[in-house]
């Protein structure tokens, strides 16, 4: 082993040991190790079978559900549970790894789309999974085709890896890669071909660029698409969801390839994440019973429908970061059978995306159909989100705004309503969780 690698391992593992004893999570160990040896990740990851999960929405939950299943088989699975998905975070994850008791080293990693190509210079995944690609942080990623090409460039570096794609996305039709490809998707009852919502991106035929129609449109640009001009249509699915048995704001049940599964997480969009997890598990040889056991133990993860109590109020924290994700979160809370207060926390830091114009493309108009007695607009850009909420027609006198997340917390604590939803952009979610953790309402880290 090279001296620089030895020094990098010493610096990284020592700092991780100290930080863990202090109860602090950080990507500092990875950053320190990489300063000694920029290739250290290659050394750390060389004996692992690696599954990479990437895409715009659903990475964290898909990864968590997959890890839950694989733990039923291997007992121990390396992962990055708090969503530290850039190279310093991935390196930190491997530095913290413990020896496998089964002799099988397996890692399931969510990786940021823009970081994937760089990371794939140092790791050799056996499976890539792309959940979806939607418009997200335009100032960082650019438009959807730019993001997709970044991911494909990374995948081409590992031509032996299988690629598991959301077959319901037209973007993923016949990707220009040498890798073997498999698809998962919804195979529910189809109807007459119709256009998607007028504000939907990524609906051009991948063959002739005509506007696609959908015989089944689950949400956004996903579903059983067909081109009436050239006949292009969704590819055959290798893993098929054939029935929605139950769908609520906090759980769902569904049938995939003849087996019924359930998760204690609400919303249609999260069923796609469960479908991806099933597809990964089946690809790796997991039997349906073990998948069910993994799902039965699954719970919401780090800011993604994470539930807790503020006083006697049952609260749910939901990450939002782009128009499609926010709209699906709103669709999910709309399923709640009880009144609830709503807090929407908008920041505009680098990790959130500095351009906040995306809030105008999210379907906040649905809140006027819900039993919401009061709304808190919070975060650095509280005035912008307050303005967006007023435009929906929701009564202005029921909207309060503040830059102080501490004040948002106090408002929830003092409200009459017994339920609360908090929709927050990434750094606002982290800041709000830190407030909660300091009060010992939630744990600082979710492992």
Role assignments for model-derived ranges:
Residues 185-323:
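Adenine nucleotide phosphate-binding catalytic loops in nucleotide-utilizing enzymes
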Residues 2-204:
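Phosphate-binding loop of NTP-binding sites
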Residues 62-63, 118-119, 139-140, 173-176, ...:
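Short glycine-/acidic-enriched loop or helix-start segments at secondary-structure transitions
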Residues 110, 131, 164, 273, ...:
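Residue-level signal for inorganic ion chemistry
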Residues 1-15, 19, 24-26, 202, ...:
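ATP-dependent carboxylate-amine ligase
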Residues 66, 70, 90-94, 274-284, ...:
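Buried hydrophobic packing segments
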Residues 76, 126-127, 161-162, 180, ...:
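Residues at the starts of beta-strands that form the adenosine-phosphate
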């Amino acid at each position: 082993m090279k001296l620089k690698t030895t020094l990098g391992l010493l610096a990284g593992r020592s700092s991780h040991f100290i930080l863990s004893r202090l109860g602090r999570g950080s990507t500092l160990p990875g950053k320190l190790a990489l300063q000694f040896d920029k290739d250290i990740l290659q050394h750390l990851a060389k004996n692992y079978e690696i599954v990479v999960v990437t895409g715009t929405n659903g990475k964290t939950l898909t990864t968590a559900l997959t890890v839950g299943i694989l733990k039923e088989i291997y007992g121990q699975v390396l992962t990055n549970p708090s969503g530290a998905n850039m190279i310093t975070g991935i390196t930190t994850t491997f530095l913290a790894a413990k020896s496998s008791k089964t002799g099988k080293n397996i890692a399931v990693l969510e990786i940021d789309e823009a970081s994937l190509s760089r990371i794939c210079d140092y790791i050799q995944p056996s499976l890539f999974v792309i959940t979806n690609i939607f418009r997200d942080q335009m100032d960082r990623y650019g438009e959807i085709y730019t993001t997709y090409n970044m991911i494909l460039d990374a995948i081409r570096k590992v031509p032996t890896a299988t690629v598991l794609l959301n077959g319901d996305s037209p973007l993923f039709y016949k990707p220009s890669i040498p890798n073997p490809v498999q698809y998962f998707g919804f195979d529910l009852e189809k109807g007459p071909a119709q256009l998607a919502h007028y504000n939907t991106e990524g609906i051009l035929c991948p063959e002739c660029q005509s506007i696609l129609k959908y015989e089944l449109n689950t949400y956004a640009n996903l579903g059983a698409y067909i081109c009436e001009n050239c006949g292009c249509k969704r590819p055959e699915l290798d893993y098929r969801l054939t029935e929605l048995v139950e769908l609520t704001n906090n759980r769902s049940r569904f049938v995939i390839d003849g087996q019924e599964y359930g998760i204690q997480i609400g919303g249609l969009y999260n069923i796609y994440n469960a479908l991806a997890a099933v597809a990964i598990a089946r690809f790796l040889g997991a039997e349906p019973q073990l998948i069910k056991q993994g799902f039965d133990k699954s719970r919401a993860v780090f800011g993604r429908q994470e539930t807790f109590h503020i006083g006697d109020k049952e609260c749910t924290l939901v990450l939002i970061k782009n128009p499609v994700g926010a709209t699906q979160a709103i669709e999910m809370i709309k399923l709640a059978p009880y009144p609830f207060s709503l807090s929407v926390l908008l920041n505009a830091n680098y990790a959130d995306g500095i351009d906040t114009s995306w809030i105008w493309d999210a379907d906040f108009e649905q809140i006027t159909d819900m039993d919401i007695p009061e709304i808190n607009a919070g975060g650095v850009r509280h005035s912008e989100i307050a303005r967006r909420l007023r435009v929906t027609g929701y009564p202005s006198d029921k909207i309060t705004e503040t830059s102080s997340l501490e004040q948002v917390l106090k408002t929830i604590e003092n409200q009459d309503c017994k339920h609360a939803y908090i929709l927050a952009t990434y750094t606002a979610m982290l800041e709000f969780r830190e407030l909660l953790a300091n009060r010992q309402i939630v744990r600082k880290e979710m492992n």
